[in-house]
């Protein structure tokens, strides 16, 4: 189990959306309740984005000993917040650098993503599978472990389109606005309406999701 989000989950938004949770589950605390043999748990990276070679080294040493790496990563509280515009759609570089390095010593990586909105995913190839927990609330860790261990059938579907590149989004050419007034020039062509109409390839389409069942 690797990643700062396994210890301090990103389970809600910030600003006026923040609530005082009665009890917050974490991956590190909850995983012992499941039929998983845990080799160890380390943070691996700094949540704030700084490079920490000692944490990275500990993560690599742990990954070598494990059959499967559960890598918890995503956008921190300052990357997306009320009243702040995101200037890009990337996961912090130190997290992705660790993911790439982990893949060199253990290719069996399950990426457990936490973010409140769409992100670029050029790092997808380094994960054997990806579980997106979004902002799962105070009981999000247990819910994700239920999916990972097969206790429940994964049946969630994306409620937004994940583009291949930020430059592919309809607002890219006029965002952020240079004046006090923001112009929503997309009109009705937002989200899947734009990508479908303009025939722009995407990473994952609106409504994408998997389950253990095949329907015909």
Locate each region found by the language model.
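C-terminal non-catalytic regions of proteins with extracellular/luminal or membrane-system context
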Residues: 1-216
């Amino acid at each position: 189990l690797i990643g700062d989000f396994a210890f301090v989950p990103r389970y809600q938004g910030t600003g006026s959306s923040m609530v005082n949770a009665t009890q917050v589950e974490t991956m590190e605390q909850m995983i012992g309740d499941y039929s998983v043999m845990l080799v160890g748990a380390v943070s691996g990276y700094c949540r704030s984005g700084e490079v920490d070679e000692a944490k990275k080294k500990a993560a690599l040493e742990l990954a070598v000993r494990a059959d499967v790496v559960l890598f918890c990563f995503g956008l921190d509280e300052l990357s997306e917040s009320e009243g702040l515009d995101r200037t890009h759609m990337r996961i912090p570089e130190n997290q992705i650098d660790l993911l790439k390095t982990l893949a060199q010593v253990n290719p069996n990586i399950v990426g457990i993503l936490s973010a409140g909105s769409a992100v670029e995913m050029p790092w997808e190839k380094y994960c054997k599978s990806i579980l997106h927990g979004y902002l799962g609330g105070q009981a999000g860790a247990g819910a994700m472990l239920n999916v990972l261990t097969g206790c429940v059938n994964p049946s969630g579907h994306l409620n937004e389109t994940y583009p291949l590149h930020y430059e592919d989004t309809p607002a890219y050419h006029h965002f952020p606005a240079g004046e006090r007034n923001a112009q929503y020039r997309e009109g009705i062509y937002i989200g899947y309406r734009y990508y479908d109409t303009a025939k722009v390839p995407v990473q994952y389409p609106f409504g994408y999701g998997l389950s253990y069942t095949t329907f015909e």
